[in-house]
From Swiss-Prot:
Family of the protein in this entry: Belongs to the class-II aminoacyl-tRNA synthetase family. HisZ subfamily.
Protein name: ATP phosphoribosyltransferase regulatory subunit
Gene this protein is translated from: hisZ
Alphabetical list of CDD domains matching this protein: HisRS-like_core (cd00773)
Keyword annotations of the record: Amino-acid biosynthesis, Cytoplasm, Histidine biosynthesis
Subcellular location: Cytoplasm
Native source species: Pseudomonas putida (strain ATCC 47054 / DSM 6125 / CFBP 8728 / NCIMB 11950 / KT2440)
Pathway listed: Amino-acid biosynthesis; L-histidine biosynthesis; L-histidine from 5-phospho-alpha-D-ribose 1-diphosphate: step 1/9
Main function: Required for the first step of histidine biosynthesis. May allow the feedback regulation of ATP phosphoribosyltransferase activity by histidine.
Amino acid sequence: MATVDRWLLPDGIEEVLPPEAARIEIARRQVLDLFQSWGYELVVTPHIEYLESLLTGAGQDLDQRTFKVVDPQSGRLMGFRADFTPQVARIDAHTLRREGPSRLCYAGSVLHAQPRALSTSRSPIQLGAELYGDASPTSDVEVISLMLATLQLADVPDVHMDLGHVGIYRGLARAAGLSGAVEQQLFDAMQRKAVDEVQALTADLPKDLGSMLRALVELCGGREVLAEARVRLGRAPASVLAALDDLLAIADRLASRYPDLPLYFDLGELRGYHYHTGVVFAVFVPGEGQSIAQGGRYDDIGADFGRARPATGFSTDLKTLVTLGRAEVVLPTGGIWMPDSGDAALWQQVCQLRNEGQRVVQALPGQPLSAALEADCDRQLIQQDGRWQVLPLAQ
């Protein structure tokens, strides 16, 4: 084996070195403290588990992003988690089984067989929050607000938000009686804004339904889109009109809380269509081709675990937040150099200093005092007048 093969990492897999690792860890603690202040409880899920459980209710997209291995003990297929949401949904539905709303959060590494885009990591540190047990737009607004608070904590500049609702397309497609194959083709064409293809796929539908489905490609822009949608989708099924009402209620609340936040509406945006059931949202910043935070409603995700519950949530990549954010992360600097000594009094003082939050580095046999500088120490323990004292490091 060539030497280079011993340290070469796979594409999209990276290691994090000091001091960047310290910045990420400090940011993780700050975000989890933020989640806790909003009433969200931390859960820790397995890195790997049986595939049937890991992919339940998650859709085809997650299946394609999941690394799969065979468990040598059981012979069953297992997968490394590519997304926390199915696992957290299982905890809510099967383990906690609470009657009222449940607020849960998480932070940890995930592994992707395929990256979201060519330039993105396959080993992001995913963090997010999920609210179970309430189907109202109020829960969606809470989750979106927490997402924005997370970005504000990291001081990510120039954010703007995209909002959509997969229930609009889903309701029209159901009313049109589209076959699974045609619905998938139309879905693909919608995502590419391929107007000619959408026209061809809806040409044989009843006039009103075909016209409304074609309108989704054009219904994108500022807040005026919602008023226009009310007119162009006025003959839509009740579920579609209810979805528009929910989207308007969410937009009103967000505009009240964040008057300077640019909101963009795209009723043909079907991000997570096989996974989400209602409102979908994503945050973008200039210069980034992918969303930096995203989420939406995924009601009844716990049904396969024996308990269907309304659910809404968001996720983001912690490493991306630290990279894009302007928040100053103050790293601890300096330290105390401890000589190599078996003196019990020295050890007692070192323990006390560490308990007080001081950083104390043990000198190893043969290390000169100059090694203290490499260890980022600016003070040293010196025995004077029969006791150990912390003094400036002798240059």
